[in-house]
Amino acid sequence: MAPPQHLCGSHLVDALYLVCGDRGFFYNSGIVEQCCHRPCDKFDLQSYCN
């Protein structure tokens, strides 16, 4: 598994598509705080999947 990393903008959206796939995801300001301002991992991203 990849180490936690900072994901912002299009990198964050691409990572969400990769992790969530066909389930889709919801995007709110909380994920920016969690993954852009601080590093996050795959499990953090999964919490935003539908």
Swiss-Prot record:
PROSITE patterns: INSULIN. InterPro entries: Insulin (IPR004825), Insulin-like (IPR016179), Insulin-like_sf (IPR036438), Insulin_CS (IPR022353), Insulin_family (IPR022352). This is Insulin 2. Insulin decreases blood glucose concentration. It increases cell permeability to monosaccharides, amino acids and fatty acids. It accelerates glycolysis, the pentose phosphate cycle, and glycogen synthesis in liver. One of its GO terms (cellular component) is extracellular space. Disulfide bonds join 8-36, 20-49, 35-40. Heterodimer of a B chain and an A chain linked by two disulfide bonds. The keyword DNA damage does not apply. Keywords: Carbohydrate metabolism, Disulfide bond, Glucose metabolism, Hormone, Secreted. It holds the Pfam family Insulin. Signal peptide: none annotated. It is found in: Secreted. One of its GO terms (biological process) is glucose metabolic process. The keyword Secreted applies. GO terms for molecular function: hormone activity. Belongs to the insulin family. Gene3D superfamilies: Insulin-like. The gene is ins2.
